[in-house]
């Protein structure tokens, strides 16, 4: 049995979960999220009102989907109650970010500014020209947007310039030695 998959998902007060076959709809104070769980995985409520994820057999694919499905549903519950935030920072001379309406505009050493449009459910906040946060209720969207932004200018291993997650340690390389 999957150690993660067999744990029930507690449902906090103020969260309404609707299970309709393979579809899960989670409503909470921050918004609404839905998910379609893979076919063999089954969802149900136990006596305490928590969500229980089960699988029909121990086939390899079903074992893999068991823990994944439980984690995805748990992420929905956390998203509609607390939300997700990713903090990022920019290193490099002249590199900066600024908010233009709901979009984020970057100066990253290219000949043009790079504009990232905020998808539905995602908000950007700029604390300083070199620090900003990405906030939303969908963990996958927040993570994907932050990865896309980091990809605009990956941290350089020689000088450390670029966009990185807050607290991320960049493995530095030693440059060439002179003659």
Curated annotation (Swiss-Prot):
HAMAP family: Ribosomal_uL6_B (MF_01365_B). It comes from the Bacteria. One of its GO terms (biological process) is cytoplasmic translation. InterPro entries: Ribosomal_uL6-like, Ribosomal_uL6-like_a/b-dom_sf, Ribosomal_uL6_a/b-dom, Ribosomal_uL6_bac-type, Ribosomal_uL6_CS. Part of the 50S ribosomal subunit. SUPFAM superfamilies: Ribosomal protein L6. PROSITE patterns: RIBOSOMAL_L6_1. GO terms for cellular component: cytosolic large ribosomal subunit. It comes from Mycobacterium leprae (strain TN). The lineage of its organism: Bacteria, Bacillati, Actinomycetota, Actinomycetes, Mycobacteriales. Keywords: Ribonucleoprotein, Ribosomal protein, RNA-binding, rRNA-binding. The keyword Ligase does not apply. Belongs to the universal ribosomal protein uL6 family. GO terms for molecular function: rRNA binding; structural constituent of ribosome. This protein binds to the 23S rRNA, and is important in its secondary structure. It is located near the subunit interface in the base of the L7/L12 stalk, and near the tRNA binding site of the peptidyltransferase center. This is Large ribosomal subunit protein uL6.
